[in-house]
């Protein structure tokens, strides 16, 4: 990858029924943890307990560069706040 290039992500907030989205352009060498934190803060949800997944529901490891995420998963991603991450439903028999 060339240094100095940028990648763009369209991030949709899944917890809002209106499915608002924002488009971010970041340096391709930026850590994806920073992208996750920035996106969460833009949507006013806690970044420490949020996750980003693909439109197909595949979780993304944030310990890689934004450029790697773009190449592996494309530009359309979904932000899941804590109330949606790892939810467990228990039904009484």
Curated annotation (Swiss-Prot):
One of its GO terms (cellular component) is cytosol. The keyword Isomerase does not apply. Keywords: Isopeptide bond, Ubl conjugation pathway. GO terms for biological process: protein ufmylation. The keyword Lipid metabolism does not apply. CDD domains: Ubl_UFM1. It comes from the Eukaryota. Residues 87-93 form a propeptide. There is a cross-link at residue 86 (Glycyl lysine isopeptide (Gly-Lys) (interchain with K-? in acceptor proteins)). It holds the Pfam family Ufm1. Ubiquitin-like modifier protein which binds to a number of as yet unidentified target proteins. PANTHER family: UBIQUITIN-FOLD MODIFIER 1. Belongs to the UFM1 family. This is Ubiquitin-fold modifier 1. It comes from Arabidopsis thaliana.
């Amino acid at each position: 990858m060339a240094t100095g290039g940028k990648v763009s992500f369209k991030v949709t907030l899944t917890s809002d029924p209106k499915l608002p989205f924002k488009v971010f352009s970041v340096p391709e060498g930026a850590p994806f943890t920073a992208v996750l934190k920035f996106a969460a803060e833009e949507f006013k949800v806690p970044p420490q307990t949020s996750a980003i997944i693909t439109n197909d529901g595949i979780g993304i490891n944030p310990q890689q560069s934004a450029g790697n995420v773009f190449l592996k998963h494309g530009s359309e991603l979904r932000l899941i706040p804590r109330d949606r991450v790892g939810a467990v439903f228990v039904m009484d028999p």
